[in-house]
Amino acid sequence: MKNRVTNIHFVGIGGVGMSGIAEVLHNLGFKVSGSDQARNAATEHLGSLGIQVYPGHTAEHVNGADVVVTSTAVKKENPEVVAALEQQIPVIPRALMLAELMRFRDGIAIAGTHGKTTTTSLTASILGAAGLDPTFVIGGKLNAAGTNARLGKGEYIVAEADESDASFLHLTPIMSVVTNIDEDHMDTYGHSVEKLHQAFIDFIHRMPFYGKAFLCIDSEHVRAILPKVSKPYATYGLDDTADIYATDIENVGAQMKFTVHVQMKGHEQGSFEVVLNMPGRHNVLNALAAIGVALEVGASVEAIQKGLLGFEGVGRRFQKYGDIKLPNGGTALLVDDYGHHPVEMAATLAAARGAYPEKRLVLAFQPHRYTRTRDLFEDFTKVLNTVDALVLTEVYAAGEEPIAAADSRALARAIRVLGKLEPIYCENVADLPEMLLNVLQDGDIVLNMGAGSINRVPAALLELSKQI
């Protein structure tokens, strides 16, 4: 690609998946530019690297580009896309550019409905501890690196593989991981579980014959596809029939301690203890996937232990902001999380309970997309009803039109009928920080959760707290 392409322009460069690829390409020596409707931390970071980031979208931005890369949020009517096509400049999706990056390195692609970002981050952490200096592109900021992407000198690139639009089928990794499969983004698959399964099978089969997949057998849908997988694979999970499994799992504060057992073909059989520097049984599974990849590339047990214990977390994945001051003179622990599907929400809430069993659990939640709220309405009401106090803000539409009886007011009514909780409704997410300060009590843990504009709440809450 380097002999034919010099200038690469990203439309929607501020998106978490786009900004990481842009940064790696910039560090590889390409001339990178981009545009976005809104400034954010990602665009500021890219600008500090010397990348030209334009505010808004106009046709002139693509002048001189050899290729234009778009995110899934960018419509074909976008003026930059229209101008590029008129000038016969290739317009490609983000995943296709990620696939090109994998041609420079041996690719390790992490797929699954939940846990991709954490598993990718843990894998990068262990490979780094093993001295393998990987390149990584992650859907969240790796706290230890201060960025969501980095160009390493080693032979591996670790990246998330996105199933939401089936774009992971562009990738050709030498190793792949499937953390789980759940019924999400079903509009992409014609609301067919069979088509969803086939997409993951096709993703695994994108590997060469010498590749290897690591598949989580704790997921019912993953177990269902195993008979159809014809490429080499190993299983992992909490069951002792898996090739890599965990026992003796215990919470040690906000960490997880467990024993790893390896009975994988071609590897030394045995067991060893690890401490994972994050809470939750679901993160034990994510760690097992990273351990499997690490063993396959030759990392030592010591490197695995170091990478897991020294893991500093990733942005918006049970990200602890510490204690905030309350108007009543007490304090509450603020934690931020990206969870927006009932399955991952339940796992994160269980992690919070396990790490802080003595605290009252307060959840501030912003549903993401009306279609998801409608399709999983009953599952949402069940998981939301498990907390001690609940504040709901309106659905983040993500470009969708409102759907009757699939909004936060409807969720609040359904939860109220169950009789355990009295949900508090906050129509405008901008009012949420002040409302939370009035709801919280001394010693609480407040979990700020959702994939939309609620991500701005922690900073605003911290600022308000400082004024007390």
Swiss-Prot record:
Recorded family membership: Belongs to the MurCDEF family.
Pathway involvement of the protein, from the record: Cell wall biogenesis; peptidoglycan biosynthesis
Gene Ontology biological-process entries: cell division; cell wall organization; peptidoglycan biosynthetic process; regulation of cell shape
InterPro entries in alphabetical order: Mur-like_cat_sf (IPR036565), Mur_ligase_C (IPR004101), Mur_ligase_C_dom_sf (IPR036615), Mur_ligase_cen (IPR013221), Mur_ligase_N (IPR000713), MurCDEF_pg_biosynth (IPR050061), UDP-N-AcMur_Ala_ligase_MurC (IPR005758)
SUPFAM superfamilies: MurCD N-terminal domain (SSF51984), MurD-like peptide ligases, catalytic domain (SSF53623), MurD-like peptide ligases, peptide-binding domain (SSF53244)
This protein's GO CC annotations: cytoplasm
Role of this protein: Cell wall formation.
EC number: 6.3.2.8
Range of residues in the leader sequence: none
NCBIfam families the record matches: murC
Pfam families linked: Mur_ligase, Mur_ligase_C, Mur_ligase_M
Keyword terms of this UniProt record: ATP-binding, Cell cycle, Cell division, Cell shape, Cell wall biogenesis/degradation, Cytoplasm, Ligase, Nucleotide-binding, Peptidoglycan synthesis
Protein name: UDP-N-acetylmuramate--L-alanine ligase
Reaction(s) catalysed by this chain's protein: UDP-N-acetyl-alpha-D-muramate + L-alanine + ATP = UDP-N-acetyl-alpha-D-muramoyl-L-alanine + ADP + phosphate + H(+)
EC top class, as a word: ligase
Keyword DNA-binding part of the UniProt annotation: no
Compartments reported by the entry: Cytoplasm
Binding-site residues for ATP, renumbered to this chain: G112, T113, H114, G115, K116, T117, T118
Gene that produces this protein: murC
Record-linked HAMAP family: MurC (MF_00046)
Record GO terms (molecular function): ATP binding; UDP-N-acetylmuramate-L-alanine ligase activity
Top-rank taxon, per record: Bacteria
